[in-house]
């Protein structure tokens, strides 16, 4: 006895030493070691000591840890006890729960007592469940405190099944689930009886003003509802109804204290999947009854809240949200249970419409998700509706449609004109953000809560507005006439209000928000997928009348303010798809656009009037949108547009940037007219540019040396002329037959097939000269000689810095306007001098567009590769590679190198890729290898970029440096991944699924040279000088803390391993077997590679499986691991030889690596720790009067989780 007390005292002192913050680290470490020794020592001593320390005479810290020790015993050492000892511990644990069930005990001890019993039930399984359940039932009858603990135990049992637990094997989980399922006829009535008994007692005690007792009974009700929630997730719904659970919860809806918890039960039931067995009828009956309960409750709320917004408090709101979520879940998951009754469905839709129309944003948002889901499901997927009649839509079913389609048609017919109109009205009204509503308009909205930045938990405004627009689109597909009428009336009403307003600019935000709705509806009805031409003539006539009337209203407007004109143009844009079917109005719309353009000043002297410049650019961009939307309807007007452009250019009232945009619109129009028209338009647009572009005078004057570029930047007019020429080259390449799909193959189209092909020979040489001299500015020897203003202009733009910092881009200064494609328009164009900002924007624009032009030029066939000399291109672009900033190298790889790698014909790899990739890979390897150690060891990446920020911003500087380093690392890794893509490696067979270990037939091995023309990776490996720096980057990437880059590199390394397997190249095999294998294992030591660990383990598996018979290195690498013995390796080889499953082999390799490193591979060791029932407050909605000690319980549980 004395020994037992002595051990208990020593354990108590050790516990106090661990929790005492003043303890030294050595003291705490010794205490932990002692406690571990007790837990791993004699199991009976552990039991006696723990039960002794949970007694009341000990402090709460000691008692709590003693409970944890008991849980450890039950969880890990239960099998060491004899059956009588186990039975005795069960009884002691139940008694212990009874002892702590008093008001003076704190919450953590109560929760751990219940958790201990739950652990015992989990270990014992169904064998002793009946005995334990009898004890629990008896305990629950002793009083509210005891009942609460019993309910906590009952709650945790099913929760431990439904939440995955590594500590519970599949068989025991199934046994426990089966035992609980068989016990539902006992458990569910107990839950109902406790719920009924203690709810009545709580009401009774509260009526007698015995508030302490009332709270105890109320806590039992809450605990009971939490337990019910845990069973509701998996117990058969008919059982929940049969044993009174649903009716009991429905009764609680009348209580403001418990209705939210009861509604949580209903929400879970509504989301349960409808069975397809014999219980379907019972399930439908339960859901139907539940629907009636929710309908009555929601009707009462909607009627009460519609009369006055002041009657809703937070409790009402939370309950209403839960009701709305429940009903929405019912409609999304179990609509079939009520859809057969048209009257019930009509009531249901009206209820959900009421929530959608509610002034509270949270309720509206939940209903929005429901309506979106419903309309997506009801409307046919391949095509939107055709309209045989004016009333609605055909749902696309045929005579042989299934019963499901028939039900959908029936439900869709219930969404009538009134419901559709209401949905549209609400959607239109809520398209505006609260912060943009002027005060006067805000007052007219009343209590309506518009979306606000202060609204939490529902994401950003952009995604919310997108959901509204999708609902508008779906409604327009279902009810075209209703939606057209509503949007037309809405727009015309807003126009009238604006015209009558003394401050029309206040209405800009409201007008602009509705343009999106108009754009959505017009595009839905006239974009072609609706088979508009196939609908009835009555509908066509009605729609034409509606939109012709609206277009006439828009064309008659004469707004003079630039901000209003921008909105006006947006509305005209939105009408584009309508013009495709009714081309008569195209001429009027084009004339209106030119009228708006010429009414605005083309020369901006005062920066405050730069809104005019932005409005002009918006008008020009509208021509592109109209050309794309109206398609062939614009073709008859091309000559008129060209004549007007010529006249305005001759008059000097059309700036080059504006001319470029209109030229781009012409290219869009020409794409609808055929190849011949496209060639003619390109010739018309490019010929004037070529006359200046190919002249040797400007090239000799400005592009012969770096100082020439400085002179160019002092000639502002010519500087911007060059800029607009390059940007138009980019637009012409994008709009004239360029297709992204070309990038997925190495086969090239015939040069004549692309209208831009024969222009490359004169376009590209001067561009290469321009880029070469631009690159030279960053050379240290040149940089020092540049004027201060030029050096300052070579720093980052504000937008680039904000992007690196992950912050919202600031509004561009008033000195800069932006095209639709993101390029810049200098406000001093045509003037004598360019500012620092102008030069910075010009340099960035030339680089961005120049790289894009080169990249796009490679995609149109072999012309690029035949009209240029590879060595000259390499010299022009790579000459100053050593001086390039990381941001520029990343852009260069992304917009040019990747394109040329994808597009270069295989027979030209030798002449092109070798000269371009060799200097690039060498420099990137040196730069990255220098920068990463600085980040990993000193916390500061060494990058050459010029940030242009003031001192004192060290933290921001560090963030930007790291972002630049990671961006470049990921870009080069993406390039490697591209080079390893199947389309560029057609000669490499796909890895077989079989993983059999065996000797490779040496006769099947080929020379690596055989892959140099049918595999990009093979080509690379055949050029050692190019391959070595690339492979070095790959190996180092594994130890850089960038999981995204590692993902890309793994793909490349996989192909390298495959080529090592297929070829007889000794050097490659040795590299893969030793260097790559070792590097991959080192990569598994990085926690940042946890997400890539399956790929890394697979590479290890492939290296060993495919190469260990031909090279000793894989075995040597594994045996060099600190904890691996030859016997371990031998056992691994025997195990892998017995299975051909790659999945099983990967698991074996993973286990071997963990064993060999002593579980020291962080990427693999980041596993879920053993689950213990400690999350005692999870999914618990606490009553407002809950004691603060509950929060303390969470803290204690986390502290003693181990």
UniProtKB/Swiss-Prot annotation:
GO terms for cellular component: nucleus. It holds the Pfam family Exportin-5. The keyword Nucleus applies. Keywords: Acetylation, Nucleus, RNA-mediated gene silencing, Transport. Coiled coil: none annotated. GO terms for biological process: leaf morphogenesis; miRNA export from nucleus; negative regulation of flower development; polarity specification of adaxial/abaxial axis; protein export from nucleus; regulatory ncRNA-mediated gene silencing; root development; shoot system development. It is found in: Nucleus. Disruption phenotype: Reduced size of roots and shoot lateral organs. Accelerated vegetative phase change. Increased adaxial trichome density. Disruption of phyllotaxis of the inflorescence. Reduced fertility. Reduced levels of several miRNAs and increased levels of their targeted transcripts. GO terms for molecular function: nuclear export signal receptor activity. The keyword Transport applies. The modification N-acetylmethionine is found at residue 1. InterPro entries: ARM-like (IPR011989), ARM-type_fold (IPR016024), Exportin-1/Importin-b-like (IPR013598), Exportin-5_C (IPR045478), XPO1/5 (IPR045065). Nucleocytoplasmic transporter involved in the nuclear export of microRNAs (miRNAs). Required for several miRNAs accumulation. Specifically required for miR156 accumulation which targets SPL3, SPL4 and SPL5 transcription factors. Involved in plant development through its role in miRNAs processing. Required for vegetative phase change and vegetative to reproductive phase transition. Functionally dependent on RAN1 binding. Does not seem to be involved in small interfering RNAs (siRNAs) processing. PANTHER family: EXPORTIN 1/5, EXPORTIN-5. Interacts with RAN1. Belongs to the exportin family. This is Protein HASTY 1. It comes from Arabidopsis thaliana. The gene is HST1.
